[in-house]
Amino acid sequence: NNFWFDDGTQVARYNGEFRSSLLIDPPNGRMPAYTQQAQERLRVAAELRASRGAFAGPESRPLAERCLMSFGSSSGPPMLPILYNNHYQIVQSPGYVMILVEMVHDARIIRIDADPLPEAFRPWMGDSIAHWEGDTLVVETSRLNPSQKFRNATESFRITERFTRVS
């Protein structure tokens, strides 16, 4: 049913230029090749999945299928567009920003100018801490929950997102 698909009306714009890629680093917009270590992690993960079987238990099923997190990568980090339900509600209060994702209604809590959470604490969407650089909210996220590894990221995975109001 194509009614529900959210194709968008134009490609992404970055620094005033329309882009066909959401990657801004490297400048060519292409995903860098996997390192040897990443290729090995992918191979080991695939072997583990195959050895357990598709229905060995709930832990072998995707988080979205278990209604723990949104489908695709819309809840983030990083928050990337998917096929539909790409709307976000952003609410700011003293010390916090909350981003509510339309898809599955994930609520991402971002603390502003805060200290990191204890090392053992690993929320589903990671530990997001933000600060303002002028009109841009810069969000640094680390400590993703091991079950929510973004694209086979390691435990030391960190990501920086920048949110700027455009209108």
Question: For each predicted feature, which ranges?
Answer:
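PEST-like low-complexity, intrinsically disordered acidic/proline/serine-rich tracts
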Residues: N1-S167
